[in-house]
Amino acid sequence: MKIRVERDVLAEAVAWVARSLPARPPAPVLAGLLLKAEDGALSFSSFDYEVSARVSVDAEVEEDGTVLVSGRLLADICRALPNRPVEISTDGVRATVVCGSSRFTLHTLPVEEYPALPQMPTATGTVPGEVFASAAAQVAIAAGRDDTLPVLTGVRIEIEGDTVTLASTDRYRFAVREFLWKPEDPDASAVALVPAKTLLDTAKALTSGDTVTLALSGSGAGEGLIGFEGAGRRTTTRLLEGDLPKYRTLFPTEFNSVAVIETAPFVEAVKRVALVAERNTPVRLSFEQGVLILEAGSSDDAQAVERVDAVLEGDDISIAFNPTFLLDGLSAIDSPAAQLSFTTSTKPALLSGRPAVDAEADDAYKYLIMPVRLSG
């Protein structure tokens, strides 16, 4: 194999594929990146039996070939190379990377032991890359981090015709985002549970493309597979077993109080007040006509109080939240104004965004957050 490729193109492609390399590969060859040169293109692939990634870039191919080298080492080398064209060639059990006056010789891994990557499933539909990335980020934030509860570490993707709904929960909050897309079949209907971290990493990586193709195969669980493709990059991941709890009935539709606050001063106030909130202690919010009073700490220890302008419709209400979960939600709505809707101080509150304080709420994204019960 002998090829020539631009340094920036090489570094970006290698970094993207190497991101999904396993920290503890189940077999030594799975720590490798597979490089394949043919027909004026150079492809890079990685696979750990769960997630596969592949990207193809234009290259001057002098000699076709395939080689398997240490992925992390190649990524480190590519990052450090000067901004000059890069030549990669193979000779027996060694691969050579030359860039300007830099020359690296790498030992190769046995290509014949590398597993075949799964085939990309048939395309189910397409969505703009920025919409997909935004939706994935808004929902993944509420997914669980506890691997002993694998179902809660996933994002549920539900497809019904031209609507896609993403949902996740860690039992303390529930995030749901809807968006429109272009299905291959107008009557498409499917449900899949995708690892949240994989979904988020993939969505971020595919924002550079105009559109992202989603492709589903299998039963939708366990042995099922989902694929994403865009901007010359494709990745597949096995689906998680199980499904999230039925959540639509958890979201209230009638409220006793609705408060609207400008997001930026609200976020800054929560951050300041939370400085005195010890680990796992809540921030208390008291809504009255025209004002929100935030408090944390106790009279026996450090204490903080702050007032923020707020518009309140309905009854006055006092409620407490985990400040991290509240800030996550305020970050995710990505709107100038935040709307908090309440039934009672002991029931979950619904957070959504508004383009302005006096505008209607955006129902495309909803963040349900459990309150913290206050002693006494």
Identify the meaning behind each predicted range.
Residues 1-376:
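Structural preference for solvent-exposed beta-strand-turn elements
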